[in-house]
């Protein structure tokens, strides 16, 4: 029987380890928030199976849903490992739902990107910007700035994940706020921006929306560069990644 731990992955990416049993799932290990369409988890889980022999099923929770599940299962843990945004990893460590774990080369991770005890650590990072399906714009110019997204021509074409639940949504809200002149102690600029953006009827899903961008359902998504480049170079879609001019 496999010892459970949860180590979480953040957008800087953390891993989290836990104790529990997974026999009811018929799997070797359980990972929360390992969606096949995010950060190429599909390929990663195949490589884990190939090189380590562990069969780990996909899981489509977002960061907030993952933390909620860990808290609900605190006394009877199910997951072995969890992946989520760094802020959720910090909370998980504070709430006592993860065990300390230090993988090989833990000491090489910069101090600001890990918990000293190993309750969370970063495994990758991403640059946030616009993941744009050029064909789905139907001739409209590719937006270059946060301000561009407020133009009426993009009504119904913009999406961002729910900031209250998904880490990438929270990261997007923080990025907008900083670009508009705010900081972590003053979110008014970001709040005012999203009030204006609401006039363009944005789509606000809770789960990763990679496939919805490629299909054209969401032409413009606040997302990370690694998802956009996967669409461009692996799935050969006519997509671009834009870093907003305001930063």
Located regions from the model:
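Extracytoplasmic ligand-binding site segments that recognize negatively charged/polar headgroups
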Residues: 34-42, 78-215
